[in-house]
Amino acid sequence: MAFVARQTFEYQMPSTWYPGHMNKTLKRLKNLTSSNDIFVEVRDARIPLTSRNYVMEDFLNKKNRIIVYNKCDLADTFHTKAKVSKHRIQNLAQQFQNVECWFKETSTPEKSAFITPYVSKAPYFAKELLRLIRTLVDQASANGRVYVYFVGMPNTGKSSILNSLRNVALRKSKSAIVGNYPGVTKRISEIVRLFNDMDVYMLDTPGIMTPSITKPEDMLKLSLVGCVKEGIVHPVTVVDYLLFHLNRIDPSLYSKWSLPTNDVDEFLQNTAYKARKLTKGGFDENFVSNYVIQQYRIGRLGRFQLDTIDKNELLIRLHNEQNKKNAK
């Protein structure tokens, strides 16, 4: 009998992950920033709508903002598909908010081995972004200090982009701590000078989640790409959600480990055996689940978007977001 993938995914999720330091950071940003300041908002291209923080929208819409969709190479297998997705995101962004959108691929040595030829040179991206920031600074203020804040959800790559800009602009080693775990930055960081000839400074900020999630499935997406602290959603549930997507896209993406299956337990046991991830105690589902999740995050289980990118989906999200705001 031919394999038939699940068409729906049943789940019960935590409402959100919103530690106290996130709310403190948001309040501080609102109180400290001026009209001259620039905000670089970093989103994950695999979840371009889900990684949009509706709590910050009213605040950021009044600011000079650049949106960077990071990790584009992990969002699509084929470059032509990536271009289509970029155009869709760009068009949606231009329709609903007056911002500049940029797209960046991953650039770490570990990841680049598996995603060539889609990786763009980090220095090139940095130079172009620096040129845009200079333009915005000139437009914002003829004199006076300007701050460039890097904001977004946890683990979207804010610190890495900040360091890349600093390295290119000043030829200095990186300053912000970079980690693959959400919550590495817990407070607004030290002030870092951006240009030698301009009074412009950069600040890294902690990743900020939303106090509540507009769609329950979003917690699964955020957990899968690494925006949510490990353990908030059980790793087996995260893998089950990944398996759901893999089966709908192409079950052969995991053929090196298992035959097509909708059973996450069967999938994990087969993976543990084929990938040689059995521990001394035998089969450890959490250990194998975390291994599978990491393989997905570096592009070894296909590269695809988890969000549906269309106008209707964004309108639904905007409606749900407004309901959340009105309920306060």
Swiss-Prot record:
Compartments, as annotated in UniProt: Mitochondrion inner membrane
Domain called CP-type G: residue spans: 23-211
PROSITE patterns, per database record: G_CP
SUPFAM superfamilies hit by this protein: P-loop containing nucleoside triphosphate hydrolases
Keyword Mitochondrion attached: yes
Record flagged with keyword Membrane: yes
GO cellular component: mitochondrial inner membrane; mitochondrial matrix; mitochondrion
Sample GO molecular function, one term: GTPase activity
Residues engaged in binding GTP: N70, K71, C72, D73, N155, T156, G157, K158, S159, S160, G207
Its job: Mitochondrial GTPase involved in assembly of the large ribosomal subunit. Plays a role in expression of the mitochondrial translational machinery.
Name of the molecule in the record: Mitochondrial GTPase 1
Main location class: mitochondrion
Pfam families: MMR_HSR1
Membrane topology: Peripheral membrane protein
GO BP terms in the entry: mitochondrial translation
Entry keyword set: GTP-binding, Membrane, Mitochondrion, Mitochondrion inner membrane, Nucleotide-binding, Transit peptide
Family indicated by similarity: Belongs to the TRAFAC class YlqF/YawG GTPase family. MTG1 subfamily.
